[in-house]
Amino acid sequence: MSKQPVALIILDGFALRDETYGNAVAQANKPNFDRYWNEYPHTMLKACGEAVGLPEGQMGNSEVGHLNIGAGRIVYQSLTRVNIAIREGEFDRNETFLAAMNHVKQHGTSLHLFGLLSDGGVHSHIHHLYALLRLAAKEGVKRVYIHGFLDGRDVGPQTAPQYIKELQEKIKEYGVGEIATLSGRYYSMDRDKRWDRVEKAYRAMVYGEGPTYRDPLECIEDSYKHGIYDEFVLPSVIVREDGRPVATIQDNDAIIFYNFRPDRAIQISNTFTNEDFREFDRGPKHPKHLFFVCLTHFSETVKGYVAFKPTNLDNTLGEVLSQHGLRQLRIAETEKYPHVTFFMSGGREEKFPGEDRILINSPKVPTYDLKPEMSAYEVTDALLKEIEADKYDAIILNYANPDMVGHSGKLEPTIKAVEAVDECLGKVVDAILAKGGIAIITADHGNADEVLTPDGKPQTAHTTNPVPVIVTKKGIKLRDGGILGDLAPTMLDLLGLPQPKEMTGKSLIVK
């Protein structure tokens, strides 16, 4: 019998705003999206701030978006959890932090703090670094070194100097800490197994290898002179007057990695924590007996201590589909595969019974503006075969392009990215409709809707604009004022399945 699948199609980084300047979503020629928008019930959803468990006004992101979508409720994000812990004094009593600090005091060794040096709030927040510096001062830790990963992606591309100056003020204020290395996140936070990048960051931190500077700001100035901005700054070493590195990571040191988002923290963490690491030769000085702390749970593969342990999410969308004996497919290209699997399942790595996954490799290019279509056509071809084969009751699909190309801050490639996705969307939705199925077309957060600032500069960060939702079923009405946490209840509603009590979101379909 022909399956009539209900598909949740996530156009990553695709939000709506009226102003067309710098707006790749508005400027793109997207006949399929426009046709569905005009023909079927539609509304807009909030995908940022408190609607997704973030601080008010904080832009959403893919991890947060998929967690909320899959959970069918507002999920309190790590950023909010840590902020509350700082505010209520719980941060200073955190046993894992205190154990790391005691470890270096007992061994007479150094504490290293590393993470993304910005207030972007997507992977980290600089205030969490300040809280760690304050705690180190309070606990009497003398040797504290900071390895700053420069952002330029979740914040403006040339904002590193302001964060470094602010950090230097805090170091002065607390009387503890020195900047030891700086590295663009392109190197230190790779997630695509481009180990040559990670190796450069590792060797700067452990061997003191790389360009050397007396002053962190001089490092940034020098990079800017060569047209290399924050995200891409080569791993660089800050040295003392005699040319020796301020600090390298050595045996018995402690590391606190203050990023809270796992995906871009895993590879560099594995480099330090895994005994059977084989991705590159770590050399004779690879530090032993490190006390390695992850701010949150990064992955089963990372052998470190976790300061803020995960909160379990029960009865996520995938689990409910599985409990009712439905077959489900998760499909995406590499860049968003963890999002439609791990994050969509509430932080669970394993598949549910009846769940299949298809991973299509993302193209190997330095930056995706060079190939705006990415692997969208390959994802589409793979999915069309599965729809034709009548195997699945539910499909969860992500198109990465509007987000990944939007991060370039380049308008033309981002328009091309949106257009490629629209072409693919048309094929997929029409195939689903031909089977008598239903598509829910939506997004997880904004990005491609604002790739230029009003004065024409690249805008590489996400946005706080609302995201669309279209349900390709005639004769229903969708309510306004919804959130991402309402999508799973809507999908269950369309499948005729009961909503579990843990899902506090509400179906968007007006009864």
UniProtKB/Swiss-Prot annotation:
Binding site for substrate: 123, 153-154, 185, 191, 261-264, 336
Binding positions (Mn(2+) 1): 403, 407, 462
E.C. no: 5.4.2.12
Enzyme active site: 62
Protein keywords: Glycolysis, Isomerase, Manganese, Metal-binding, Phosphoprotein
Listed GO CC annotations: cytosol
Reaction catalysed by this enzyme: (2R)-2-phosphoglycerate = (2R)-3-phosphoglycerate
GO molecular function: manganese ion binding; phosphoglycerate mutase activity
Keyword check for Translocase: no
Binding annotation for Mn(2+) 2: 12, 62, 444-445
UniProt keyword annotation of Cell cycle present: no
Names of the cofactor(s): Mn(2+)
SUBUNIT field: Monomer.
Descriptive protein name: 2,3-bisphosphoglycerate-independent phosphoglycerate mutase
Species whose genome carries this gene: Geobacillus kaustophilus (strain HTA426)
Lineage: Bacteria, Bacillati, Bacillota, Bacilli, Bacillales
Gene: gpmI
